[in-house]
Amino acid sequence: KRLLEKSSNGHITGVDYSEVSVQKSKKLNRAAIQEGRCEVLQGNVMNLPFSENSFHLVTAFETIYFWPGIQVAFQQVYRVLKNGGTFLICNESNGKNTKDEKWTDIIHGMTIYTSEQIEKALKNAGFSKIQVEQNEKGWLCAICKRDN
């Protein structure tokens, strides 16, 4: 919804693995969907249901923890980004706080990646201009480009 507010002339496509999340997002964004400004799909980041060079921007907020393999997932994001497109990742955990371990202990399949792991996987997927920032609370934000 916030991306729609910031992109009054754009089209937003949302993808989530969870059917429950897809239905909630469709309900929240009903007006924009009816206007043709938004679509929400169920999908898997390991095999994104889009053609190459489809998007100017791909975001991942609090989600890469649950991707089965970030290397393959980042390659999929790279594939669907247009040349010059941006990939933005925001995580509340940076993998360096001992408190992070409690989450991986109670949430099956969750992996908290360090900035170094994310940067390496982005580079291996072909991304350039990679910037990774962290704050004092442990939040991590990575931004990079597809340039080719």
Where are these regions (language model features)?
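Class I SAM-dependent methyltransferase SAM/SAH-binding core
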Residues: 1-47
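Surface-exposed loop/turn positions
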Residues: 10, 52-54, 84-85
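Short alpha-helical
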Residues: 19-20, 65, 139
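A short acidic, Gly/Pro-enriched loop at the edge of an enzyme's catalytic core
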Residues: 46-58
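A short SAM/SAH-binding and catalytic strip from SAM-dependent methyltransferases
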Residues: 56-70
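A short glycine-rich, Lys/Arg-flanked "PGG" loop and its adjoining helix->strand segment in the class I
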Residues: 71-83
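C-terminal alpha-helical "lid/dimerization" subdomain adjacent to the S-adenosyl-L-methionine
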Residues: 75, 85-143
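C-terminal beta-strand of the catalytic ATP-binding
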Residues: 144-148
